[in-house]
Design a protein with these regions (language model features):
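C-terminal (or distal) subdomains of carbohydrate-active enzymes
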Residues: 23, 190, 201, 205-637
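Active-site neighborhoods of enzyme catalytic cores
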Residues: 1
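Catalytic grooves of carbohydrate-active enzymes
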Residues: 4-210, 221-223, 492-569
Length: 637
């Protein structure tokens, strides 16, 4: 965004450590390294190593470099980056590097089961604590609920611990001789989720007018008006009846059942204003609900699904791949590239023990309807990759641009999946686990010419400059990470296809290689650890075919909708109302967080669009004073 930040790069004379695949020669402040820096004119060279959280030779036995000063350059001082840049460095530079997310080169064990679980658990906790803070803010604002500082802070503490470096790079290592880092992440995120759930439950119990089961209260934790499906947990006994929902104008909304993990939920379409709420009456339906979304087998053996936005055709004879995906809102455009040898939603990877690539298209699949009603239709594709069973689900929702998908693989034994023939050596930068082309991928060959990749990053969207995402050495890493979403778009900005994931992982793409999502790697990993398959693999992902650019189609907001679904609860009889804490002109900004500090409500916003023109924020209420606050809490106005 043009903000300038003075930083310290890796110096040109700072070589990678010979025989290492994880650090540079700066790691130990050796005399040779420091003299190389001094000889090139660097007056106060730094070595970049953060003290670890749990190493046995940590601060209890002295600083990182230890007491043997003969091993490294002296004098050496320990500094924070802020202290170094302000007080020790020259403080200025003539360099003007325009930083990109693709300057961040991470080579973790993407696609392994342990990383999928860890990343998924962290993602759930990240979304949960932010929603909990927002719901707590509503409850304090409207009902005077005490701000649960200790519970919120503890939720953030355990979440931040789960984001620690060692959790992700050595998840199998034992923490203080007990549980592994991955097992500890499960515990840490469990605390965050439990605290978040308790905070939300406390908020909901205060916000609803009274106890009961006749009114549904719905809350929106985003700064955009929403008209979408919401799920409310209801008694199991209700399954014996059909139900309808009424808005404050008395208009009936159809409802549809969904059972997840043994919990009965009723889904209906709710219209809720920005940063606001709406209530609905729920009643038994007097008549059977008519009309369902289409899902039926065709005469040619294919299977067709349809909503008001999409027509989708599956081919059971080719493993249930999607042969056609037409977007009605994009003038009926066909998004599937049937000229590509890879199928759309095909699963394919190199199975080392079988000696070659295996594909879900090699065997026919069974397609069946799991859920069908007036609001959504969901089908299951059951097939095999070699001897291994898989189930893919696809859900189309009326009025919803997002196509929700899931894949579950039931493994037999511990198959090895990835590039073959690469013997692991710790000192060899060449590694089998880097090349995604050999991993089990879900392929999405898309009929888009002159493709350009965009991908989200923390408070940023990156326009990729990569010709492809492929590499096989530690010293040649490319940024192939999908945080929340990746968008493959046409360079003429006519259309695109966005892929969303439920966990941080890697994606694949190249000039002659379609967009694909990493589903599985199994084999040797960092430091020679065997990354095994020891349970079923299950991940969720989603697609949005769209016209125009990611920006025009508000893909960032679509991702936020997926991360923060509407919150709903049952309550007693009440006057049906709706309201909004604040509105932003044109729904221009994203609501990052809402927290109380004393009696002041701090609202953090983010502009994910390129439009930097001023926007009006309108607050509901008479006694409101707003001030702009910097991130370090300085009041600007």
């Amino acid at each position: 965004d043009g903000t300038r930040l003075t930083t310290v790069p890796r110096y040109a004379c700072e070589d990678l450590q010979p025989g290492s695949c994880w650090q540079s020669i700066s790691w130990f402040n050796t005399k040779d390294y420091i003299h190389k820096c001094l000889d090139t004119g660097i007056q106060h060279p730094v070595g970049m190593c953060i003290q670890d959280a749990a190493w046995s030779h940590g601060w209890d036995k002295g600083p990182w470099l230890g007491q043997d000063t003969a091993a490294y350059y002296t004098p050496t001082a320990y500094k924070t980056w802020r202290n170094y840049i302000q007080d020790c460095s020259v403080g200025t530079t003539q360099d003007d590097w325009h930083f990109s997310q693709e300057d961040v080169l991470g080579g973790l064990m993407w696609g392994t089961q342990v990383m999928q679980r860890l990343a998924g658990e962290v993602r759930v906790a990240e979304n949960a604590i932010v929603r909990a803070e927002k719901m707590a803010a509503y409850a304090r604002l409207y009902k005077g609920m005490e701000w649960l500082t200790e519970r919120i802070d503890e939720g953030w503490r355990t979440l931040l611990l789960s984001q620690h470096h060692d959790c992700w790079i050595v998840p199998y290592n034992q923490l203080q001789g007990k549980k592994t880092w991955a097992e500890t992440v499960t515990d840490w995120t469990g605390v965050t989720n439990q605290n978040s759930r308790q905070i939300i439950d406390n908020a909901l119990s205060l916000l609803k007018e009274k106890e009961g089961e006749s009114t549904v209260y719905v809350y929106n934790t985003l700064a955009t008006d929403r008209n979408e499906l919401v799920a409310v947990e209801v008694p199991v006994s209700w399954r014996n009846s059909d139900w309808v929902v009424l808005d404050k104008q008395g208009k009936k909304q159809p409802a549809q059942w969904l059972t997840e993990d043994g919990i009965s939920k009723l889904l209906f379409r709710a219209q809720v204003p920005s940063a606001g709420y709406a209530s609905y009456a729920i009643r038994k339906a007097e008549d059977k609900q008519s009309g369902t979304l289409k899902a039926e087998r065709q005469k040619d053996g294919t299977f067709r699904m349809e909503s008001d936005l999409y027509t989708l055709v599956l081919n059971p004879s080719k493993g249930g791949v999607i042969e056609s995906l037409k977007a009605k809102a994009v003038r009926g455009k066909e998004f599937v590239d049937n000229r590509n040898e890879r199928g759309f939603n095909e699963l394919r990877g190199y199975f080392i023990d079988e000696g070659g690539f295996l594909s879900s298209m090699d065997q026919p699949a069974e397609v069946s309807v799991l859920e069908q009603g007036p609001l959504f239709v969901k089908v299951a594709v059951k097939g095999k990759i070699g001897k291994y069973s898989f189930t893919q689900t696809i859900r189309l929702t009326q009025g919803e641009p997002r196509i929700d998908m899931n894949v579950k693989l039931d493994w037999t034994g511990n198959p090895r999946i990835g590039e073959p023939g690469i013997e692991f050596r710790a000192d060899n930068p060449r590694k089998a686990f880097y090349d995604d082309r050999y991993k089990l991928l879900v392929y999405l060959p898309t009929q888009i010419a002159n493709q350009q990749i965009y991908k989200d990053a923390p408070f940023d969207v990156c326009e990729s400059r990569l010709e492809n995402t492929f590499f096989n050495r530690w010293d040649s890493i490319k940024h192939n990470i999908i945080l929340n979403w990746v968008d493959v778009a046409s360079k003429d900005n006519s259309c695109g296809l966005s892929l969303f994931t439920d966990h941080t992982t890697s994606y694949a793409h190249g000039k002659d290689f379609p967009l694909a999502l990493n589903v599985q790697y199994a084999g040797k990993g960092l430091w020679g650890r065997d990354y095994i398959i020891d349970r079923p693999t299950e991940i969720s992902y989603a697609l949005i075919p769209h016209a125009g650019t990611w920006e025009k189609s508000r893909i960032w907001t679509q991702s936020e909708r997926r991360n923060e679904p509407l919150v709903a609860t049952l309550g007693g009889d009440a006057t049906l109302t709706s309201g909004s804490l604040f509105r932003i002109e044109n729904n221009a900004y994203e609501l990052v967080s809402m927290v109380y500090k004393g009696n002041d409500l701090y609202i953090r916003l983010f502009n994910a669009q390129s439009d930097a023109s001023p926007k009006t924020i309108t607050f509901q209420g008479q006694d409101v004073k707003a001030s702009l606050v910097e991130l370090d809490n300085r009041l600007v106005e």
